[in-house]
Amino acid sequence: MKDKFSAQREKMVQKQLAKRDIEDPKVLDAFRKVPREEFITESKQHQAYGDHPLPIGHGQTISQPYIVAMMTQALEPSSHDIVLEVGTGSGYQTAILAELTKKVFSLERIPELSEQAGRILSKLGYQNIVLKISDDDNDLTIHEQKEFDKIIVTAAASQIPPELTQQLKEGGTLVIPVGELMFQELLVVTKHNGELRKKSLGGCRFVPLK
Protein backbone atom coordinates (compact mmCIF):
# COMPACT_ATOMS: atom_id res chain seq x y z
CA MET A 1 0.00 0.00 0.00
CA LYS A 2 1.41 3.36 -1.03
CA ASP A 3 1.50 6.20 1.47
CA LYS A 4 0.34 9.70 0.58
CA PHE A 5 3.93 10.90 0.11
CA SER A 6 5.09 8.06 -2.16
CA ALA A 7 4.52 9.99 -5.40
CA GLN A 8 6.43 13.00 -4.05
CA ARG A 9 9.23 10.70 -2.91
CA GLU A 10 9.56 9.11 -6.35
CA LYS A 11 9.47 12.53 -8.02
CA MET A 12 12.29 13.67 -5.72
CA VAL A 13 14.37 10.62 -6.65
CA GLN A 14 13.82 11.09 -10.37
CA LYS A 15 14.10 14.88 -10.70
CA GLN A 16 16.41 15.98 -7.86
CA LEU A 17 18.74 12.98 -7.74
CA ALA A 18 18.76 10.71 -10.81
CA LYS A 19 18.64 13.61 -13.30
CA ARG A 20 21.65 15.15 -11.64
CA ASP A 21 24.69 13.03 -10.82
CA ILE A 22 23.32 10.49 -8.36
CA GLU A 23 23.78 7.27 -10.32
CA ASP A 24 24.24 4.51 -7.73
CA PRO A 25 21.03 2.43 -7.92
CA LYS A 26 21.39 1.29 -4.30
CA VAL A 27 21.56 4.90 -3.12
CA LEU A 28 18.52 5.83 -5.19
CA ASP A 29 16.59 2.86 -3.79
CA ALA A 30 17.45 3.92 -0.23
CA PHE A 31 15.92 7.34 -0.92
CA ARG A 32 12.80 5.62 -2.25
CA LYS A 33 12.46 3.66 0.99
CA VAL A 34 13.10 6.28 3.67
CA PRO A 35 10.11 8.57 4.40
CA ARG A 36 11.68 12.02 4.75
CA GLU A 37 8.41 13.47 6.04
CA GLU A 38 8.79 11.44 9.25
CA PHE A 39 11.91 13.43 10.17
CA ILE A 40 10.21 16.83 9.83
CA THR A 41 7.68 18.57 12.05
CA GLU A 42 4.07 18.08 10.95
CA SER A 43 3.67 21.74 10.01
CA LYS A 44 6.55 21.42 7.49
CA GLN A 45 5.70 17.98 6.08
CA HIS A 46 4.18 19.47 2.94
CA GLN A 47 7.72 20.70 2.13
CA ALA A 48 9.38 17.36 2.88
CA TYR A 49 10.40 16.63 -0.71
CA GLY A 50 11.40 20.12 -1.78
CA ASP A 51 15.01 20.57 -2.88
CA HIS A 52 15.99 22.66 0.13
CA PRO A 53 16.95 22.30 3.81
CA LEU A 54 14.36 22.64 6.57
CA PRO A 55 14.72 23.67 10.23
CA ILE A 56 14.48 20.92 12.85
CA GLY A 57 14.97 23.08 15.95
CA HIS A 58 17.97 23.93 18.17
CA GLY A 59 19.51 25.94 15.33
CA GLN A 60 19.91 22.82 13.18
CA THR A 61 18.53 21.78 9.80
CA ILE A 62 17.77 18.70 7.75
CA SER A 63 19.87 19.04 4.60
CA GLN A 64 18.32 19.17 1.15
CA PRO A 65 17.87 15.68 -0.35
CA TYR A 66 20.46 16.21 -3.08
CA ILE A 67 23.21 17.06 -0.58
CA VAL A 68 22.38 13.98 1.51
CA ALA A 69 22.46 11.85 -1.65
CA MET A 70 25.73 13.35 -2.91
CA MET A 71 27.45 12.73 0.43
CA THR A 72 26.05 9.21 0.64
CA GLN A 73 27.16 8.30 -2.88
CA ALA A 74 30.63 9.76 -2.25
CA LEU A 75 30.93 7.50 0.79
CA GLU A 76 30.52 4.44 -1.49
CA PRO A 77 28.63 2.49 1.19
CA SER A 78 28.44 -1.31 1.12
CA SER A 79 26.43 -3.88 3.04
CA HIS A 80 29.39 -4.95 5.21
CA ASP A 81 30.42 -1.44 6.31
CA ILE A 82 30.48 -0.22 9.90
CA VAL A 83 29.82 3.52 9.70
CA LEU A 84 30.29 6.48 12.02
CA GLU A 85 28.00 9.46 11.50
CA VAL A 86 28.93 12.65 13.32
CA GLY A 87 25.81 14.78 13.72
CA THR A 88 22.64 12.71 13.95
CA GLY A 89 20.44 15.78 13.52
CA SER A 90 17.00 14.72 12.33
CA GLY A 91 18.09 11.10 11.79
CA TYR A 92 17.29 11.14 8.04
CA GLN A 93 20.88 10.64 6.91
CA THR A 94 21.19 7.96 9.62
CA ALA A 95 18.25 6.05 8.13
CA ILE A 96 19.66 6.29 4.60
CA LEU A 97 22.97 4.86 5.84
CA ALA A 98 21.16 2.10 7.75
CA GLU A 99 19.50 1.00 4.50
CA LEU A 100 22.90 0.63 2.83
CA THR A 101 25.33 -0.63 5.48
CA LYS A 102 25.73 -3.24 8.20
CA LYS A 103 25.71 -0.94 11.23
CA VAL A 104 25.61 2.80 11.91
CA PHE A 105 26.95 4.53 15.02
CA SER A 106 25.64 8.09 15.14
CA LEU A 107 26.95 10.79 17.46
CA GLU A 108 24.95 13.90 18.41
CA ARG A 109 25.84 16.73 20.81
CA ILE A 110 22.25 17.96 21.34
CA PRO A 111 20.41 15.43 23.55
CA GLU A 112 16.93 16.52 22.45
CA LEU A 113 17.76 15.89 18.78
CA SER A 114 19.27 12.49 19.51
CA GLU A 115 16.21 11.48 21.52
CA GLN A 116 13.82 12.72 18.84
CA ALA A 117 15.75 10.90 16.10
CA GLY A 118 15.79 7.76 18.23
CA ARG A 119 12.01 7.76 18.53
CA ILE A 120 11.56 8.18 14.77
CA LEU A 121 14.14 5.54 13.82
CA SER A 122 12.63 3.09 16.31
CA LYS A 123 9.15 3.74 14.90
CA LEU A 124 10.47 2.96 11.42
CA GLY A 125 11.92 -0.33 12.66
CA TYR A 126 15.68 0.20 12.27
CA GLN A 127 17.72 -2.24 14.35
CA ASN A 128 21.23 -1.60 13.01
CA ILE A 129 21.63 1.91 14.46
CA VAL A 130 23.36 2.90 17.71
CA LEU A 131 22.75 6.50 18.78
CA LYS A 132 25.19 8.22 21.12
CA ILE A 133 25.08 11.61 22.82
CA SER A 134 28.43 13.40 23.06
CA ASP A 135 29.01 14.89 26.51
CA ASP A 136 32.00 16.83 25.18
CA ASP A 137 32.00 18.80 21.90
CA ASN A 138 35.65 17.81 21.45
CA ASP A 139 35.01 14.07 21.86
CA LEU A 140 34.26 12.48 18.49
CA THR A 141 34.95 8.89 19.50
CA ILE A 142 32.75 5.84 19.98
CA HIS A 143 34.40 3.83 22.71
CA GLU A 144 32.89 0.43 21.87
CA GLN A 145 33.99 0.66 18.22
CA LYS A 146 37.59 1.67 17.56
CA GLU A 147 37.65 1.79 13.76
CA PHE A 148 35.15 2.46 11.00
CA ASP A 149 35.00 1.55 7.32
CA LYS A 150 33.28 4.83 6.54
CA ILE A 151 32.78 8.13 8.40
CA ILE A 152 30.36 10.90 7.44
CA VAL A 153 30.14 14.31 9.10
CA THR A 154 26.96 16.36 8.70
CA ALA A 155 28.27 19.65 10.10
CA ALA A 156 31.23 21.80 9.06
CA ALA A 157 34.61 21.57 10.78
CA SER A 158 37.24 24.30 10.48
CA GLN A 159 39.72 21.53 9.64
CA ILE A 160 39.64 17.74 9.37
CA PRO A 161 39.59 16.45 12.98
CA PRO A 162 42.54 14.09 13.54
CA GLU A 163 40.44 11.99 15.93
CA LEU A 164 38.25 11.06 12.96
CA THR A 165 41.07 10.10 10.59
CA GLN A 166 42.56 8.02 13.41
CA GLN A 167 39.30 6.06 13.61
CA LEU A 168 39.17 5.54 9.83
CA LYS A 169 40.22 2.07 8.70
CA GLU A 170 42.89 1.56 6.07
CA GLY A 171 41.14 1.90 2.72
CA GLY A 172 38.24 3.72 4.37
CA THR A 173 36.45 6.89 3.31
CA LEU A 174 35.56 10.06 5.22
CA VAL A 175 33.10 12.62 3.81
CA ILE A 176 33.19 15.97 5.60
CA PRO A 177 32.43 19.67 4.98
CA VAL A 178 35.45 21.78 5.93
CA GLY A 179 35.79 25.54 6.24
CA GLU A 180 34.51 28.63 7.98
CA LEU A 181 30.93 29.88 8.17
CA MET A 182 30.89 31.77 4.86
CA PHE A 183 32.89 29.30 2.74
CA GLN A 184 33.08 25.56 3.10
CA GLU A 185 34.25 22.74 0.86
CA LEU A 186 32.86 19.22 0.82
CA LEU A 187 35.80 16.83 0.97
CA VAL A 188 36.15 13.11 0.34
CA VAL A 189 39.12 11.79 2.31
CA THR A 190 40.51 8.28 1.78
CA LYS A 191 43.23 6.51 3.73
CA HIS A 192 45.93 4.61 1.81
CA ASN A 193 48.98 3.16 3.56
CA GLY A 194 48.33 5.52 6.44
CA GLU A 195 48.29 8.58 4.17
CA LEU A 196 45.23 10.75 3.54
CA ARG A 197 44.12 11.63 0.02
CA LYS A 198 41.61 14.43 -0.42
CA LYS A 199 39.18 15.21 -3.22
CA SER A 200 36.84 18.20 -3.32
CA LEU A 201 33.19 17.88 -4.33
CA GLY A 202 32.83 21.67 -4.41
CA GLY A 203 31.45 24.41 -2.20
CA CYS A 204 28.75 23.81 0.41
CA ARG A 205 27.07 25.39 3.42
CA PHE A 206 26.56 23.51 6.71
CA VAL A 207 25.95 24.47 10.31
CA PRO A 208 29.17 24.41 12.41
CA LEU A 209 30.28 21.13 13.96
CA LYS A 210 31.08 22.77 17.32
UniProtKB/Swiss-Prot annotation:
The active site is at S63. Keywords: Cytoplasm, Methyltransferase, S-adenosyl-L-methionine, Transferase. It is an enzyme of class 2 (transferase). One of its GO terms (cellular component) is cytoplasm. Its EC number is 2.1.1.77. It catalyses: [protein]-L-isoaspartate + S-adenosyl-L-methionine = [protein]-L-isoaspartate alpha-methyl ester + S-adenosyl-L-homocysteine. Signal peptide: none annotated. It is found in: Cytoplasm. One of its GO terms (molecular function) is protein-L-isoaspartate (D-aspartate) O-methyltransferase activity. Coiled coil: none annotated. It comes from the Bacteria. Its main location: cytoplasm. GO terms for biological process: methylation; protein modification process; protein repair. Catalyzes the methyl esterification of L-isoaspartyl residues in peptides and proteins that result from spontaneous decomposition of normal L-aspartyl and L-asparaginyl residues. It plays a role in the repair and/or degradation of damaged proteins. HAMAP family: PIMT. Belongs to the methyltransferase superfamily. L-isoaspartyl/D-aspartyl protein methyltransferase family. This is Protein-L-isoaspartate O-methyltransferase. It comes from Natranaerobius thermophilus (strain ATCC BAA-1301 / DSM 18059 / JW/NM-WN-LF). The lineage of its organism: Bacteria, Bacillati, Bacillota, Clostridia, Natranaerobiales.
